[in-house]
Amino acid sequence: MDELTQANTLAIDEDLVDSVNSVKGWGILKSLNPSYPDISLVENVITFGRLKDSTVHYNDKSISGSHCKITRESNDDDGVVIAFIYDNSTNGTFIDNIKVGKGSRCLLASGQEISLTPQKQLEKIAYIFQTVEKEIEDGGPSNKYFIGEMLGQGNFATVKLAVERTTGVKYAVKIVDKKKYFMNSSARKDSLMDEVNILRGLSHPNIIQIIEVFENEKVLSLILELVECGELLNDIVSNLFYTEDKAKTLFRQIVDGVLYLHNKGIAHRDLKPENILLKHKNFNQNDAIKLTDFGLSRTVSDGSFMKTMCGTPQYLAPEILTSSGGHNGYGLEVDCWSMGAILYIMLCGYPPFDDSREVSIFEQIRNAKFEFDPEDWSSVSEEAKDLIKRLLCVDPHKRYTCNNIIQHPWFNPNVKLSTLLEEDERLRKKAEAEVEANNNNTNKSNSPKMLGKRKSEDGNCSDSNNNNNSGSKSLSSIKSNTTMLDCDEKSNNNNNNGHKKSKSDPTSNNSLFNNDNNNNNNNNNNNNNNNNNNNNNNNNNNNNNNNNNNNNNNNNNNNNNNNNNNNSNDTTDSDTDDETISLPVITKNSKSMSNLQNHLNNNKINSDDESETSTNNNNNNNNNNNNNNNNNNNNNNNNKPSTINNNFPVPFPKSPTKNSPNASPPIKPQNSSNNNSGLAGIDKPKCQYDPNCYRKNPQHLRDFYHTVSSNK
């Protein structure tokens, strides 16, 4: 035994030890007044009073004739002693200084004090009631320890004074009733031994020490280090609140004890002033504080979390309140929240969260709604209040740990609060910048893809390997166009000098057929002319020599009958560049079908034109490059069809020329009364690819006649 423990000794009457060991009855009353002897309880009914026929006779006039009686009501087979005391007195019978009341009875427990006289009486007649149960035969604590008065009581456990019979050293014995304990449905089978297993592996001056364990079928008895100065809560209440210096001294000992637990991976989970005991009043000693009541403690391994709703509401961390809702549980941080609430009480005398407010206590905790009333906190330093704020932090990841507490300005004079606050502000701004950057990246990646040209291409639609493109299109020119034909990303012609391939049609012919009355015929020195408007019915064609290398003729569509549409459904578009230029969307022209039929009926193909353009009256169109966009008709069988305005125009087949003698002759559209589209009275042109039409989409089948369409 250490010196401090040895100091807690009691002069034990050897007769008491002998009487308990030699008693033949079921209990004993140990007299607290040397003038009166001990009483062995042998009979099942023992009477006390001034009457001569009383089992225990008294001559004191303060004792009634029939003062009280003690009865034993138990089964000898199970060895459990159940005893009651009945009060028949005028002046009263007292159990632990509480009056039973005339005509009432009280259940007796080992270690209780029975007094037959009021406290104000000079001569006290009192006894300590002690049962001799079967646990002595089973190796219980009563064989080694004298069980004395009650020190505390809980739902399923009582704490009593225990005196070692051979040495007289005083301890505390915590007696747990197993039956009551397991009536709690949430208790695990092995949970009863949690406190035992945890305490056995601990040794710290600020943690209660376990001395010995006794267990039988009915009770679990823990012999613990005795702490005689009571609970921290009672001391705070008696002082109203602590001075900041006293609070700092005691709180540091609490932190040291909790830090020791956390380093071993143990969470107390029920830290509160009631579970913190004072060993002595010399607070400057490092063992003045003792953490106790580890019944709710759990060992937390790395990466694991606890999910049980436990603890006292005023000291519960927010994550405990939400742990039963499917969240990730909680860890050691819950003890730090509880320490914040304890420090708050130490400095002002009342808890930070209270049921008496309009907002529920759980809502207060979830949102950390507490305040520092100037009336009570004006004399408290900003460092102390700042530490409380950091402990009562809703986010457990940002909450201060025990190591952080020790390095806080309230404990560490080398750290200034202003420096700490500046660092907080820097981290806050950094976090905001990171969040803003992440939001920008998210918005950019989630923004809809707009049709347009890559900025990196600087106006060139073709992803060609030729660096001799002379026709670059300015950004303002792109923005001014009301129609846009996307160009293929990859061109197989490395010497196209700006030659562009339209994405919207495998034949590179735009399917926008416009009735333009003032279309200009241009003499282009660059093959970057997409001939988007080559399929126009022109009435007044002027011959202009235009040397602009990137003339797409797209602006001519602004003067047409609003047949333009920039909504291409080409499924072969592989452009993944995020940086696109948004162009205005053109509404669908309701006359697109009639324009299509007019074009099919009026269009003539000039087989002698080596450039194979399909314009109607553009005989003066002098292109100096034979690799015209219409050469892309060879891709008809290799590319998927596109859709514009939900119409599916048939690309014109090649006419036999010198360069392509095997080209098929043009097929004139045929009208058929067989209307597969379901629109009665409207004749449809025959598909030029029938019966080998590769366009299998429903819209095309409805717009063009097929002799074998039923098989498509």
Swiss-Prot record:
Domain of life: Eukaryota
Record-linked SUPFAM superfamilies: Protein kinase-like (PK-like), SMAD/FHA domain
Keyword line: ATP-binding, Coiled coil, Kinase, Nucleotide-binding, Serine/threonine-protein kinase, Transferase
Stated name of the protein: Probable serine/threonine-protein kinase fhkE
Family statement drawn from the similarity comment of this UniProt entry: Belongs to the protein kinase superfamily. CAMK Ser/Thr protein kinase family. CHK2 subfamily.
Source species: Dictyostelium discoideum (Social amoeba)
Transmembrane stretches, start-end: none
Entry annotation: catalytic residues: 270
Span list, region Disordered: 431-695
